[in-house]
Regions:
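Short, well-ordered secondary-structure micro-motifs
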Residues: 52-54, 118-119, 142
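Short, flexible loop segments at boundaries between secondary-structure elements
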Residues: 157-165
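Short glycine/proline- and acidic residue-enriched helix-loop micro-motifs
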Residues: 64-79, 103
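Small/aliphatic-rich secondary-structure junction motif
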Residues: 3-71, 97
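General small-molecule cofactor/ligand-binding pocket signal
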Residues: 43, 105-109, 160
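Structural beta-alpha unit
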Residues: 1-7, 49, 59, 83, ...
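Glycine-rich, Arg-bearing micro-motifs that act as flexible, cationic patches
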Residues: 128-150, 164
Length: 167
């Protein structure tokens, strides 16, 4: 059996929740992209309204009005978050000018975070996923966030999960 070399890391998917601690995981993505001459696809997923919430709002506003409001505002929200991601990226480059990288794409989706990350891995044909870990609740969710756990379990590509300082 011959040992193959580690594949190049040319396409990195950086999944972010845009929290204050997101910069820590992003620095790893920047460093890897810089070192291997790769690019970064940024992904932020907005969790969709629960089925209970959807039913409640529909019962109050009516189905047609609720669909109309969602359609009108959904793109505005996605565009605003995309702008926030661009600013986040520019700020990081200013803070670490010695570590330039290429931004391949900025993607904002609505849905289940783990599912959308896994879909984006396939769509972007990335070589590596970088994301932060921050569980909530019971022992910090057994030391890893539920989204990162689900992505690790099901992802076909390597996943680098960055523990946040003090976590």
């Amino acid at each position: 059996m011959t040992l193959k070399t580690i594949p190049d890391i040319r396409k990195i998917l950086y999944a972010t929740d845009l929290s204050d601690n997101a910069i820590y995981a992003f620095r790893y993505a920047m460093s890897l992209a810089n070192r291997y001459g790769g690019g970064i696809t940024f992904l932020h997923v907005l969790e969709d309204i629960s089925s209970f919430g959807n039913t409640l709002v529909t019962s109050i506003l009516g189905e047609e009005r609720w669909k109309e409001l969602r359609k009108q505002n959904e793109q505005k929200v996605l565009d605003a978050i995309k702008e926030r991601l661009k600013a986040f990226c520019e700020e990081a480059v200013r803070d670490l000018p010695e570590c330039p990288f290429i931004t391949d794409e900025i993607v904002v989706k609505i849905g289940n975070p783990a599912e959308e990350i896994l879909k984006q891995v396939d769509e972007s044909d990335c070589d590596l996923v970088v994301m932060g870990s921050h569980g909530q609740g019971l022992l910090e969710d057994a030391m890893m966030g539920s989204v990162s756990r689900r992505v690790i379990r099901r992802c076909k590509k390597p996943v680098l999960v960055i523990r946040l300082p003090g976590a």
